[in-house]
């Protein structure tokens, strides 16, 4: 069964520019490691949309990464490569 929207503006549109947020353990260089992993999986990074912020306790770091994906498979692969990192607690 295939589900389609009557409105093409609904949902993800590919190719497109997206942003993923990741929370992980601070002090593990996730600020540089996660963008590197995304680049290796074949997505184009949007350098000006890469940022990070440490938690108030300094225990965690939140990393936001902008990237371009050509299709849903590439988007899903980007999400998966981040989830697979052992220091990543969650992705959004």
Curated annotation (Swiss-Prot):
It comes from the Bacteria. Gene3D superfamilies: 3.30.70.260. InterPro entries: UPF0250_YbeD-like (IPR007454), YbeD-like_sf (IPR027471). Pfam families: DUF493. Belongs to the UPF0250 family. This is UPF0250 protein PD_0532.
């Amino acid at each position: 069964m295939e589900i389609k929207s009557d409105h093409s503006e609904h949902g993800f549109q590919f190719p497109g520019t997206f942003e993923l947020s990741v929370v992980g353990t601070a002090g593990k260089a996730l600020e540089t490691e996660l963008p590197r992993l995304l680049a290796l999986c074949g997505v184009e990074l949007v350098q000006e949309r890469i940022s990070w912020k440490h938690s108030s306790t300094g225990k965690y770091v939140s990393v936001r990464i902008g990237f371009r994906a050509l299709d849903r498979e590439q988007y899903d692969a980007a999400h998966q490569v981040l989830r697979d990192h052992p220091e990543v607690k969650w992705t959004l």
